A protein has these predicted regions:
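Short hydrophobic alpha-helical segments enriched in small aliphatic residues
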Residues: 9, 19-22
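N-terminal glycine-/serine-/threonine-rich phosphate-binding loop
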Residues: 29-86, 95-108, 112, 143-165, ...
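A glycine- and small-aliphatic-rich helix-loop capping segment at beta-alpha/alpha-beta transitions
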Residues: 100-111, 131-134, 184-195, 229-231, ...
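Glycine-rich oxoanion-binding loops at beta->alpha junctions
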Residues: 119-165, 208, 213-214
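Conserved phosphate- and dinucleotide-binding cores of soluble alpha/beta proteins
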Residues: 168-169, 177-251, 259-268, 425-427, ...
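Gly/Ser/Thr-rich active-site loops/lids in small-molecule metabolic enzymes
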Residues: 188-206, 258-273, 385-413, 501
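Accessory alpha-helical/coil subdomains and C-terminal extensions
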Residues: 214, 232-235, 257-354
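Internal helix-turn-beta structural module
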Residues: 398-504
């Protein structure tokens, strides 16, 4: 079967897996297909996940955004008025954003000889572009600063400094930008900065906490890139990987004012007991900041000669957009849909166990096959000795462990990172269902042992339940698709009402 999927660019013909579709009414489009309740299986869960991710890919959302600005007559987006257009940035979506931008500029009649750019991206996404250099800054599965990324960040800073008074800077920011744009403060080596980041990751620090520290040991984060730009206007285009889309947190806000301080960075390290573990150079740098001996990160947007801000930020896509597209596809596939929203956060295991309890409850209450969709991003606190995995694989394993304590049939979970990566692995996440439990029992695998060791990758690899979609060239946190086959009872909406009544 072929057709235009919800969330896919107009005219993009996509082959749709048909394992879960019933017969189609003649002469009907995808929005009018008539089908019996679909069979719930991994293929359906994966198709829903892909529909959500496709809607937040740059080749779809960036042209849509620019077209909207053109129709609204926003003078800032008349690209022909600028002598030079400088393009910089970093993130997992950087390559696709740069390619889509070049194509959009060409369509707008811009002479590309006036365009110059440098964007730090994962190695696997590099491709030749006409005027924007895509710099291979790190290999897949290495979500931490590298010497290659630091070199690229220095080039980006130099390019921003080269702007003339009437030039435009377009900054392309997406998830993963913090690790792809490392430029340590004077006196701090990249290895020392890596040591700090690894310690924070191990402790389960939130992205906001990590970035408060990163911004205060960096020459490019926390608004410092915008501070170095000397041109007319900076337009920052963002694909958000942070709950609530805070501009100062996404990729550590290289062009955004920073509300955090050296005191905040110090407090984060103190909270996790890391002050004695971090390198002396980092501790001394932060202490100098606390004493006011070195400048704070900028707290306001830089102003132009006309007194107006020289930087404007635009969020093109977020976790909410992916959830909406996934929900639309699920409904058109014949499912009832419940959205838990883009705000799930906290320690992975208790969040996953709660979702497993909800799945058991709803299965007894709903009467239609239902998709329960959730986003956000949980965290995993790791001991120094641990196995292999990522937060989505750990989520699926904790969910499965809880589900195994009752009847696991009729429930399928797909937990996946929308960037196609999950921790330092080649998987985006994993499936959790009754078949996984059967395979584990056959092989004598103890779920609790793997969960205790934080070794979810090894477990799911052994039972052929890893989810490996490859790099998606976007990143809007995580997307979980939970499919539930009804045992008996009422509608999904009524089940929610009843749950709130009993839980309250």
């Amino acid at each position: 079967l072929t057709g235009n999927r919800p969330g896919f660019a107009s005219g993009e013909n996509i082959a749709l897996p048909h394992a879960f579709y019933g017969s189609l009414a003649a002469n009907h489009g995808i929005g009018e297909w008539i089908m019996p309740p679909p069979a719930l299986n991994r293929a359906l869960a994966e198709a829903i996940w892909h529909a959500g991710v496709q809607a937040v890919r740059p080749q779809y959302c960036l042209p849509q955004f620019l077209l909207q600005r053109y129709r609204e007559g926003d003078p800032r987006f008349d690209f022909r008025q600028y002598p030079r257009i400088l393009v910089v940035g970093g993130g997992k979506a950087g390559a696709a954003m740069a390619a889509a931008l070049e194509e959009a500029l060409t369509s707008a009649g811009v002479d590309l000889s006036r365009v110059e750019g440098w964007v730090n991206v994962p190695n696997e996404t590099v491709r030749p572009l006409k005027r924007i250099h895509l710099h291979p800054a790190r290999p897949m599965g290495v979500n931490e600063p590298t010497p290659e990324a630091a070199y690229g960040a220095e080039q980006i800073l130099q390019l921003a400094r080269s702007a003339g008074p009437d030039d435009l800077l377009i900054c392309l920011i997406s998830g993963g930008g913090s690790a792809l744009l490392p430029l340590p403060a004077e006196g701090i080596s990249l290895a020392e900065k890596q040591q700090v980041v690894r310690a924070l990751l191990r402790c389960g620090a939130t992205i906001a906490e990590m970035n408060a520290v990163r911004k205060h040991i960096s020459r490019i984060k926390g608004g410092r890139l915008a501070q170095e730009f000397t041109g007319r206007l900076c337009l920052t285009l963002i694909i958000s990987d942070v709950i609530g889309d805070p501009l100062d947190v996404i990729a550590s806000g290289p062009t955004a004012p920073d509300p955090t301080t050296y005191a905040d960075a110090w407090s984060v390290l103190e909270k996790y007991g890391l002050l004695e573990e971090i390198p002396v150079s980092v501790r001394e740098h932060l202490q100098r900041g606390l004493r006011g001996e070195i400048p704070e990160t900028p707290k306001d947007l830089p102003l132009g000669p006309d007194g107006k801000p020289r930087v404007a930020h635009f969020v093109l896509a977020s976790n909410r957009h992916a959830l909406e597209a996934a929900a639309q596809f699920a409904r058109q596939s014949g499912l009832e849909v419940l959205q838990l929203g883009p705000y799930l956060e906290g320690e992975t295991r208790p969040v996953a166990e709660t979702l497993a309890c909800l799945a058991r409850y709803w299965r007894e209450e709903i009467r239609q096959p239902t998709a329960i969709l959730s986003g956000g991003e949980t965290t995993v606190s790791l001991p120094k000795q641990h196995g292999k995995g990522g937060r989505n694989q750990e989520f699926a394993l904790a969910f499965l462990h809880k589900l195994s304590q009752s009847d696991p049939n009729g429930v399928i979970l797909l937990a996946g990172g929308t960037d196609g990566e999950d921790g330092p692995t080649d998987a985006a996440g994993a499936f959790a269902d009754a078949e996984v439990l059967r395979q584990a029992q056959t092989r004598g695998l103890n779920l609790a042992d793997f969960l205790t060791r934080h070794d979810a990758y090894t477990f799911f690899d052994a039972v052929a339940a890893l989810f490996r979609p490859g790099l998606t060239e976007t990143n809007v946190m995580d997307l979980r698709v939970l499919l539930i086959e009804p045992a008996a009872g009422v509608s999904a909406a009524d089940a929610v009402t009843k749950w709130h009544g009993t839980a309250g």
